[in-house]
């Protein structure tokens, strides 16, 4: 997390977290520290699942799923990056190559994509148990948000990776994410950007809608 003091901006109690783009679950201690009672982890890269499972296996009400989240239902090629998978993405590299020339894609992995609203419907879980969404999917963050459909109204906080130029080809820019979330009364309250034009932002729901 780039925003290390994120908890200062959480003005409502956090119940559960939905974490899309889990990687190896490095944020699990933060969730434990700040009282999240449940965490759903989604990671499409099968190579990372054993590490993720080992990290969260003894944590109560932490579950992981080896699927990708998107607003379309299909199979797709996940481009696996050479930095232990951290920069893996469904999208081709854009200006990321300029700022991180050492990072490249080394192979593809066919993954299954599903929508978050569909996941909650077929899994029988209640999305009302989760009011915090963490999205780190290297360029397809807006697709993840759209996959919630109207269920996005159940959330209080959205913590997302953002970019202000095309770090990945055809990625959504922060202005597009701002505009989409504004439809549901989410306002960006804090942003931390890097010199490479990507960063993190916290969106908080203002009032009721």
Enumerate the language-model features and the residues they cover.
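Phosphate/nucleotide-binding beta-alpha loop and adjacent structural elements of enzyme active sites
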Residues: 1-209
């Amino acid at each position: 997390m780039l925003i290390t003091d994120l908890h200062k901006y959480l003005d409502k109690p956090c119940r559960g977290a939905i974490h899309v783009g889990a990687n190896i679950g490095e944020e699990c201690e933060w969730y434990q520290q700040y009282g999240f009672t449940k965490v759903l982890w989604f990671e499409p890269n099968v190579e990372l699942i054993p590490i993720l499972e080992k990290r969260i296996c003894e944590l109560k009400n932490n579950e992981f799923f080896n699927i990708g989240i998107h607003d379309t239902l299909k199979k797709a090629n996940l481009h696996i990056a050479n930095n232990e998978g951290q920069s893996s993405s469904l999208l081709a590299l854009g200006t990321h190559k300029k700022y991180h020339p050492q990072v490249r894609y080394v192979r593809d992995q066919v993954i299954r994509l599903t929508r978050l609203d569909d996941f909650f419907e077929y899994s029988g879980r209640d999305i009302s148990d989760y009011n915090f969404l963490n999205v780190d999917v290297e360029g397809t963050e807006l697709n993840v948000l759209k996959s919630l459909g109207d269920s996005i109204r159940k959330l209080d906080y959205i913590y997302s990776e953002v970019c202000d130029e095309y770090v990945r080809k055809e990625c959504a820019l922060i202005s597009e994410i701002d505009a989409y979330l504004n439809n549901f009364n989410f306002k960006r309250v804090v942003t931390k950007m890097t010199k490479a034009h990507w960063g993190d932002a916290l969106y908080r729901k203002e009032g009721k809608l």
